[in-house]
């Protein structure tokens, strides 16, 4: 079954993660004739809301790499406030051309633990904050 809705979900300090995730998600939505939605969890207020993506939908979830890991600031939100409900996920990490170390595995595990089925992953070189 093809997803009926594609969600672009990101934390983006420089705008590069947003640009990358939205481009991937929009192209998927266009190709699959699915509804497209965005969710930006960059600002703290957005991380106070539970985000639930139900079965039959797909989330392209992106975050930057800090020291080769999912940023500590984001771990509680991704672990406690993002729910998969059987949805598909495409984890995407952006890194500053050094190394993304374990972040891709870490983000995939966080999403899987919260009820997502990761069907692909992406590690993209992009502008970094430091």
Regions found by a protein language model. Give the residues of each.
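FMN-binding flavodoxin-like domain, especially the glycine-rich phosphate-binding loop
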Residues: 1-44, 48-130
